[in-house]
């Protein structure tokens, strides 16, 4: 009887699996991946043409050495992250399609210590790892519009995408998720997350730096987020 039950279960599972069009599923996933890569390339090419990119080895290598422990202790392939440093006073960093991570020199200068900087970068890496970037763009721009830009140039749409990525917030739930994931990244790498919370709190205050602080305006309720991290 047991043998018959096992056979029946096997064929039941087999019948269910046979109803799934795996070829179609993988083709859809492959198409999504191709779209994301194309978008990432197009957006980055636009940034390269309009911004000043930092290639100084002393700066690039220092940032890379800071990121290595975060990646190593959290199972993230360092080479999968395409990190770019832009010479700009704005205190900002943002994630882009296809694992691009843009960091402004204004953010690096504003952070009083490495832990604070890594907290911010961990937050953006969490957006990348959680596929939040494409979710955000699909919701705010529209998947059909995103697909159209990969098949032909559209300056207005491209500008809107860049604005969405660099100057608008994610859903509150995704922001909280990214904060908490960043804290996990830090703790797994034996890095104190409290300076990250301190950084959020300081930037939430009304001071001269505030006018350059895009990261706070696109990540609202920084004081409340700081308290959540500390708790």
Predicted regions mapped to residue ranges:
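A Zn2+-metalloprotease active-site environment signal
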Residues: 1-231
